[in-house]
From Swiss-Prot:
The lineage of its organism: Viruses, Adnaviria, Zilligvirae, Taleaviricota, Tokiviricetes. The chain crosses the membrane at residues 150-172. This is Uncharacterized protein 268. One of its GO terms (cellular component) is membrane. Its main location: host cell. It comes from the Viruses. Keywords: Host membrane, Membrane, Transmembrane, Transmembrane helix. It is found in: Host membrane. It is a single-pass membrane protein.
Length: 268
């Protein structure tokens, strides 16, 4: 692998700035030159064997020549694959959780015919049968007791119709649940380009999302919100999970041009 270097001025630390391989190589090259030179410049800058430049950067003294390692992992590119590997691992775990959730949905779908059959029997067939039997009994008593039996029949009918209404509402809720289960969610992975101007995170055809996961792998702070208020920060290396139905209503921007990664759980 070729060793790349950055300018000394880029070593000035900015808020939430990530140390790239070229920056690390530059820092270690300066250390190597300091050790080769020695003298007052070495003793005035090095403290306890460490490089220390006030308000800029602090690093252990060392020189890696051909390869750079951070936390035991090689840094090969400016994109820092350590963070990317971490994102892929997290996304894989979240995908497995969604797939497990879908398995639970499919099991619920298989049980729905039994639930609907039971609701129909309990709320309609059995109730109508009981109503017919009770109404027949009340009418037979009407010939004997007169007006009191008529009032009793009226009260019974009022109660029965109220029960029918509540049963119909319950059945409608069951059917609505069936409609949701027949449209299970899928997963879409997107790369979203951001600038310093707020813009929607999604501009495609109309979709309905259950939840969205955003991962910020850039060196910039990403802010998210709606069209007017979008000041909630996502720091470099952080992720955010939120639930929203229409992703086109979500706006985001960053302190510099960058790309963020998104995982959409979409209802088809």
């Amino acid at each position: 692998m070729s060793v790349t270097y950055t300018s000394i001025s880029s070593l000035l630390a900015s808020p939430f700035q990530r140390l790239t391989s070229s920056m690390w190589n530059t820092a270690t090259l300066l250390l190597y030159q300091l050790y080769e030179t020695g003298g007052n410049s070495l003793t005035s800058i090095l403290q306890n064997g460490n490089l220390y430049i006030p308000n800029n950067i602090s690093a252990l003294a060392g020189f890696f020549q051909k390869e750079v390692y951070v936390s035991g992992q090689p840094v090969l590119t400016e994109q820092d694959p350590i963070y990317i590997a971490g994102f892929i691992g997290t996304a894989n775990q979240q995908i497995n959780q969604i797939l497990y959730s879908n398995q639970q949905l499919y099991y619920s779908i298989s049980q729905l015919p039994k639930e609907i059959s039971y609701d129909l029997y309990t709320n309609l067939y059995r109730t109508i049968s009981d109503l017919t039997s009770t109404l027949s009994s009340q009418i037979s008593q009407l010939q004997k007791t007169g007006i009191n039996a008529l009032y009793s029949i009226a009260d019974f009918l009022a109660y029965t119709f109220t029960y029918f209404y509540l049963a119909t509402v319950g059945l409608a809720n069951t059917l609505n649940k069936l409609t949701l289960f027949l449209s299970p969610p899928t997963i879409e992975g997107l790369q979203i380009s951001l600038s310093t101007i707020p813009s929607p995170i999604y501009n495609g055809s109309t979709i309905e999302t259950v939840r969205i996961i955003l991962q910020n792998l850039s060196n910039y702070i990403v802010y998210i919100g709606n069209k007017l208020y979008n000041s909630f920060p996502i720091l470099p290396g952080d992720s955010l999970e939120f639930h929203v139905r229409n992703p086109s209503n979500v706006y985001a921007w960053a302190t510099g041009k960058c790309t963020v990664y998104a995982l959409f759980e979409v209802v088809q």
